[in-house]
UniProtKB/Swiss-Prot annotation:
Lineage: Eukaryota, Amoebozoa, Evosea, Eumycetozoa, Dictyostelia
Pfam families named in the record: Amidohydro_1
Taxonomic source organism: Dictyostelium discoideum
GO MF term set: guanine deaminase activity; zinc ion binding
Cofactor note: Binds 1 zinc ion per subunit.
UniProt enzyme class: hydrolase
Name of the molecule in the record: Guanine deaminase
Pathway: Purine metabolism; guanine degradation; xanthine from guanine: step 1/1
GO cellular component, one term: cytosol
Cofactor(s) the record lists: Zn(2+)
Any one of the GO BP annotations: guanine metabolic process
Function, in words: Catalyzes the hydrolytic deamination of guanine, producing xanthine and ammonia.
């Protein structure tokens, strides 16, 4: 057995996380120790004898040669939860968040989205928006995010640099689109392939394990066959993740059918071009057939559930229960700016509403619980990005990506009362909490400014 690294910091108090879906562990009187690499080396919970807890604190500090006053964080009546994982966000669209919600997907792209994304050829404009969106995500407790950038190589690299400076964990994708796009916002096939390869190489060369490239064909209608073949090959060669959109909107699905009449389904299009595998994240997936769900499960592809966007653009409601029963990796996505809110807490709430809506028409449907939704925002997301061995909860050996939540902060959006259990207070935070309750944020053990 390998010797554990030296512990440099201890967190003492209530810890809340999930190990399996549907079960939230609420662990009072807990003790977590992390090393200089931000890896959890010690985790013990539910001390019944508080004197023993304090003895263990003193012993760990002594054994590791650290000062108890400087190295122990007593959370008091606050609690610790894992960082949220946003599995689908369009960083440039943050400029439009909260506006342009009056149109369905394809018209929305044409009127609002492509015009703003085309502006990111201006690096001053890009730096302003990208700095703000990353800061906002962090303030809402998002420690890991899958970002779509734009078609612009330099601006996409700039987003990666901003993310790296802020200390966020992220996957950054230079968007690829070489057809069926506006004249002012489109690449040639050669440009898209060349710039994407260059982008991937540049990000990998930076050597930051927290910030990785992700191959990003926008969606099948905007990418030629030649481009999709090249992107599939690139992802295989570099072993990067892949992200795209699938079956978000019925008009989109009909469009794909007209483009690929000889291929069985929209999902099969991605498989045809080697873009559907265990490293792939498909956003939305609202209108999948049973055969497509089976294919996604077989391919070990992940789905990013984006309920705010699905509601806002009138795209439809994903049947989350059906996806979970098919043993598909599933996480949550804000989908800024189709989704108007950057907070994964809000996505959790809308995912529950979305699931409840299926019960209206099917009394046998089992709606999503808040415990299950919390799992999707943490462990579920970690599985989607293939980092469940590193993040998602507080198991020893994982990185310490965490939020300290203060339910009693001045001007908290909710109130707590005598006699309430820790579960009551946690549930209030899930339904009523916001960025005001975020006291501290850590990514791989580093305290993040927000």
């Amino acid at each position: 057995m390998m010797k554990a690294n030296k512990i440099i910091k201890l967190f003492k108090g209530t810890v809340i996380h999930s190990i399996e879906i549907g079960k939230v562990e609420i662990l009072p009187n807990s003790l977590i120790g992390i090393d200089e690499d931000g890896v959890i080396q010690h985790m013990k919970s539910n001390y019944e004898d508080l004197k023993q807890l304090e003895k263990d604190v003193t012993m760990i500090c002594t054994d590791n040669g650290i000062n108890e006053q400087e190295s122990v964080i007593d959370m008091g009546n606050k609690f610790l939860i894992p960082g949220f994982i946003d599995t689908h966000a369009h960083a440039p669209q943050y400029h439009n968040a909260g506006t342009g919600t009056d149109l369905p997907l394809l018209k929305w792209l044409e009127k609002y989205t492509f015009p703003v994304e085309s502006k990111f050829k201006d690096l001053i404009f890009a730096e302003n928006v990208y700095g703000k969106v990353v800061d906002r995500m962090l303030r809402h407790g998002t420690t890991t995010c899958c970002y779509y950038a734009t078609i612009h190589l330099e601006a996409s690299e700039l987003l990666a640099e901003i993310v790296s400076k802020r200390g966020q964990r992220a996957f950054i994708g230079k968007v690829c689109m070489d057809r069926h796009s506006p004249d002012h916002y489109v690449e040639t096939t050669e440009q898209s392939i060349s710039n994407t390869k260059e982008f991937v190489d540049r990000i990998l060369a930076k050597g930051n394990p927290l910030v990785q490239p992700i191959v990003t064909p926008r969606f099948a209608p905007s990418c030629t066959d030649e481009l999709m073949v090249a992107l599939g090959n690139l992802s295989h060669e570099k072993q990067t993740l892949i992200q795209s959109h699938l079956s978000e909107n019925k008009d989109e699905i009909e469009w794909v059918k007209s483009l690929y009449p000889g291929i069985e389904s929209y999902t099969h299009v991605y498989k045809h071009f080697n873009l559907l595998n265990e490293r792939t994240i498909m956003a939305h997936c609202v209108h999948l057939s049973d055969e497509e769900i089976k294919l996604i499960s077989t391919q070990q592809t992940a789905i990013s559930h984006c309920p705010i966007s699905n509601f806002t653009l009138s795209s439809g409601n994903l049947d989350v229960r059906k996806v979970l029963e098919a043993n598909i990796k599933l996480g949550l996505g804000s989908d800024i700016s189709g989704g108007y809110h950057p907070s994964i807490l809000q996505v959790i709430r809308d995912s529950i509403k979305c699931s409840n809506s299926h019960f209206f028409n099917n009394g046998n449907h089992t709606p999503l619980t808040f415990e299950e939704a919390f799992y999707l925002a943490t462990v579920g997301g970690s599985k989607v990005v293939n980092l469940d061995h590193r993040i998602g909860n507080f198991i020893v050996g994982k990185d310490f990506d965490a939020q300290i939540i203060d339910p009693f902060v001045q001007n908290s959006p909710f109130d707590c009362f005598d006699g309430e259990t820790l579960k009551d207070i946690f549930q209030k935070f899930i339904y009523l909490g916001d960025d005001r309750n975020l006291s501290s944020l850590y990514i791989k053990g580093n305290k993040i400014k927000f």
